């Protein structure tokens, strides 16, 4: 028996490369094919799918195409398939897969997991003291004023392990955590106990790294010029050992890059504190060791784990107010005055500002002085209005703006609707539930197996606390100006209505400078539009990294955010474009051109 389990990922989001599953299965040896399809935004998308196309849906339909391509090969090679593509309807997906298997003549055992759906139990749970307090707004769900349309508990990996223990070849999951599709198979392979927290933490870190697919193999990488090719970027494989240490790699002959840098970037993606919470374990990101172990091979070891928290996270989506966004291009001189006149005309035509519950105005100054092309003379005026009265928005709202086409400022040209179209938006409501109310249900043939979370079992509480690390200050003599991103990498993303921006250095000296330079106050100076938000800073000296957690920057989450970049994917590159002063020695050490 092999002393490792090789878990390949074939998807980082709903819409990822369709051929990735087949390429992962046929490209080399793996033991498990996994995929993550469920971003917070995806649950809202699946709800809309179910509402508009039928209650029999609510799952990730493209996964069925992948199963059709790889089911026979996986059965022949004894490759297990574990995916959260079941979304809001894991039973429906499992039934659809069984039909495909029958058509193909493939004899694979399909299990599905449910029990995560709380929509019908919200009132009962509230009567038992579960307030479903928003972890961002700190107000209970009953005060939201919105109707709940989805509510799903984030499960861990133990039900997956149970299904595999009982012989399942394909395990269809609902809203499990992103890393659960790795934790479950690893726990199955090595027969881990519930309190093997260090090993579980290692698998959690491995799952976090590979859950976004090609992103840890050079995708969206700050130092993209290091990546040999972006053609056919490979998808990641985690080679996990019994102690939870692992190596990240990809199939040979694929594009992309697996390096300490690409893995560090992914480790910093969509996190908050160094304590990474999961229903099965808390992984301490400040304890891990990362090292290059060969071409396209990065080894991670030393991860410490603690007992899981006493609560499970719940992803709730509610029906919010109606929103509509329009964007108009203003051109040439006197942009701010033109914007003022245009907005005054819009609201006069609509009957006044006061009729709307909220108004968000963004003037995006992409125009250049003395432009050399027509497009360089444009600035974008972006307007989003919110109302609980749908009659004030939609076609009427757009018509009233269109009427200004020949009767307003010179050089305006409409981009029309961009994003919100006047319909009700789905508002993301992250909450917690006491784990005593949680049980995971495994369906395998005629059998129904209840799996209790670790929190409901009798285990001693264990908590790891890392010793503080003292960072030496770098002596500063001669300084030079340079773009922040010439020296430092970033990776940013969304966490509900919040965003994170991880920053890392590539040498000890560069980290020493970064550690003392990039305070929260300094970040707000560099990014003035972030000044109004509460920001927390966390240190990860083992990765030469800092992480900034920015509260409320995305409003009520990606599905209703007013920002152009609703998921904060570009925030890090915005920071990297800023000009700063640094010690000249750092520029020389890294051989960077100013």
Predicted regions and their residues:
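N-terminal amphipathic/basic leader segments beginning at the initiator methionine
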Residues: 1-23
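Conserved phosphate/anionic-ligand binding catalytic regions in large, soluble enzymes, centered on
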Residues: 84-89, 168-185, 490-507
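Gly-rich Lys/Arg/Thr-decorated short loops/hinges at beta-loop-alpha junctions or inter-strand turns
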Residues: 2-4, 40-56, 75, 117-146
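Short, Gly/Pro- and small/polar-rich lid/capping loops
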Residues: 270-298, 458-488
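Helix-rich interaction surfaces within compact, conserved domain-sized segments
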Residues: 533-594
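Catalytic or ion-translocation cores adjacent to nucleophile or general acid/base/metal-coordination motifs
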Residues: 102-118, 183-224, 228, 516, ...
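C-terminal non-catalytic interaction/assembly regions of soluble proteins
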Residues: 302-482, 495, 504-511, 516, ...
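A conserved active-site cap/scaffold subdomain adjacent to cofactor or substrate pockets
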Residues: 200-302, 323
